[in-house]
Every structure is written in C-alpha cells, then in structure tokens.
Amino acid sequence: MISNFKGGDPMASIDNQDLSVTKHHTLYDAIDPTSALKSSASGKVIFITGGSQGIGQATAVAFAKAGAKAVYITARSEQALKETQDLIRQTNPDTQCAYSTCDVTNTAQVEAAVSDCVDRFGGIDVADANAGYLDKWAKIGESDPKSWWYAWEAHIKGAYHVIRFSMPYLIESAKRWADKGSSGGHLILLSSIGAQLLFPTASDYQTSKHAINRLCEFVNVDHGQDGIKCFAIHPGGVATELARNMPEDHYSYLTDTPELAAGFIVWLASGKADWATGRFLSANWDVEELTSLKDEILRDDLLVNRLRVRADS
C-alpha cells in the first residue's frame, strides 16, 4: 500500500490504494444501526475519545441506536459533551451515557476516564480512539515544530493511551462474549486514506496516520491471541471542523457523512469483520463486497503496510 505520487494531483494515487468494490458516501442498510445492525450492541459498553462532535458524536449516537448498554464519551469541551449526552439520551433512553473532559495526550486523564467508565458501567467492550488533530498544512521546512509534533501526540500517543488503559477490560470482554458464543473486545483506531498517500505539506498528519496502521498491526500481534480485534479505519472524507484546515482545493473530496463512518464502526464491533483484525479498512467500502474478498485478503495478506521489493528472478 505505497503511493506512487511523484507530482501533479496526489489524489490520483488513491486508486492504487483502494479495493475494487462499490464505494458508499452515506449510510446504507448493511451498516444501519436501526435495521441490519439493530440490537447488535445490546449489553455492550462503548468508550469513545473525541466523542463530542463530528464522527465521534455520530458514532456515539449510532451505538445508542444499535442498543448499547452504555456509551462513555470524552473530549476537551464539557459543553459539547453535555450536548452529545443529551442527544444520546434522546436517541435511546435505555442507553446510559456518561462523559469526562479529557486530553488524550495526558496519560493521567485518559487512565482516569477509562477507570470512571469501568466504575460506572462494569467494563468496556468497544474502545474507539477517535480524537484527532489537524492544523494548517505546511512544508516540513516551514512548519511549526510544536504543531507538527502535536499531530503525533494526538494521534499516536492518544491512541496508545486508549489501547493501554482499555486493554485489560477489552480482554475480559472478548472472553466474556466468546463464552456466550458472540464477539467482544473490539478496538477502533481512526486512520485515514492519507496514511497511504504523499500530499505535499501534509507530513505531520499523514505520517502519524500511517503509524496508526502499524500500531493496529502490533495490537493484533501482541493481543490477537487474547481475543482482541483491532481495526485502523479511514472514516471517509467528512467535512468536519478539523478537515477544514486542509487546503481549499481538497474540500471537494469531503463528500461523506459522519453517519457512514459511524455505521461502519458499529458493523466492525458487531463481530462481522473479526476475520480482518489488524488491517486497514475504509468506511467507503461496501461491507458485503469486502466480506466476499475475505479469502483473497487473508491469502495474500492484503490491507497491511509492507515494504514492496522486487523478488530475485
């Protein structure tokens, strides 16, 4: 999954990083939490960072629609968290919701948020590392060092914190649901198609997202035997507040709804894609067509990051 971009339009290289399946831009039946995935989250506790707006908020609401026992959300704005909590309660009064203000780069705050979630609701079945950061793009030699590095702090350190502190509870979840003949212990890491591309001036965002994909693979290597299912996902091109920091000529690619990503995450947490653990997946991909490619993906070890070299003849 290596971009061949050498100049011109970097988006042209996306086709080299994509599956030949139908692409979706809005919610559709197979990932709809009110139809195909109705009650799929019943009895489960969902932990979401960056859960107060955009994709995180849509994901929290989607899990409520899918019948989650509880949704725990974190973000830095208490007012936005309260608004999302109210929205979840309106969506499904039977889904409990709690929140805490939290900076994902702060070790103590993430640990405290995870502990609070477990104290309130008894565990964690799905952890979604959704919080992100995107500043104005700049060439490496013209970038702000503090801002450039903060992208890594928010994406990698933030995801690591979620993984590290939720892991014991996710392992418990995986075992508990397996004993019931079902699936638990799901971990979602927010990546991007940009992880596979080379956009001039996007080095901080795209390198950190590329590292997310590798981190996902390591979770699978270290904890796959514990029943953990981890996915690094491209949520689609969503016109979030952060995305507006991209150059304006990229805005035309922001055509996907946050509900698409949210439904895709609920689908992943349902156990239907457990076979694809440790891999990069896109919310745009039709899930039924993706599933039809299971044997090929596993046989050829696709949707992972590897160095491509020419074999000796």
Residue ranges of predicted features:
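Catalytic loop of short-chain dehydrogenase/reductase
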Residues: 133, 171-225, 237-238
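Conserved mid-core segment of classical short-chain dehydrogenase/reductases
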Residues: 111, 119, 133-150, 168, ...
